[in-house]
Amino acid sequence: MPTGPLAPCFSLTHASVLLPDTMDFSSSTSAPFPAPAPMFSGSPRTAPDESGIWTVELVDHEAFSSVQLKRVFSLPDSRHVVVLVDAKALLRCADRDPTDYVLPAVPYWPSGKVKGLREFLEPGQTRIPEMPYVLFSTRRSPGLGGLVGLSREGVVSFRNGQHRARYLGFAGASCFPVEVHETEAESLRKYCGWVGAERS
């Protein structure tokens, strides 16, 4: 895979990405000031270190330019896999979560929460944060297409790491890894999988 200097993120070899359906993944949550927008070209490169640590590059994030993440389930028989997701696509699906636990955009967080997340994710610490852990499902889309069963949309629920995921998207990560049960991985790739800068 390409290994150019402008590549924005990394993935593991088993986290293959499928071409998703054509959808509008612009943010559905307004904010008083915009999140940093990815400004790059080229394709992601895959280069996890030997211990399986992922490094996610951030764009226009003054505090630090990258974040390290590790797997939640590291045992071979865990039946969970890593999927490299498009940040905007994943968060759009997460906004559809029917539960009451859907966080607002980062600019609406209390300043102490933003500071705490930033310190938690800062690289160079002994403890490496775990990647977000999600559940994925689909439902009928609004409108006629969904009514007749011809159109569906993805729904993401966070088991852990929603603050991390939303902060990464705000900080300019175009894509990042998440962990999901193997039975849901294919659908997650279809609706949210990273396929390049043009996807965002």
Q: Which sequence ranges carry the predicted segments?
A:
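Amphipathic, charge-rich alpha-helical segments that serve as recognition/docking helices
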Residues: 185-200
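Short alpha-helix boundary/capping and kink motifs at helix termini
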Residues: 2, 13-15, 24-52, 57, ...
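Short active-site loop/helix that positions an aromatic residue
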Residues: 162-174
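ADP-ribosyltransferase catalytic core
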Residues: 176-184
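Extreme N-terminal basic, low-complexity initiation segments
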Residues: 3-8
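Short, solvent-exposed loop/turn segments at secondary-structure junctions
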Residues: 90, 141, 163-165, 183-186
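Structured alpha/beta or helical-core interaction and ligand-binding surfaces enriched in interleaved
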Residues: 65
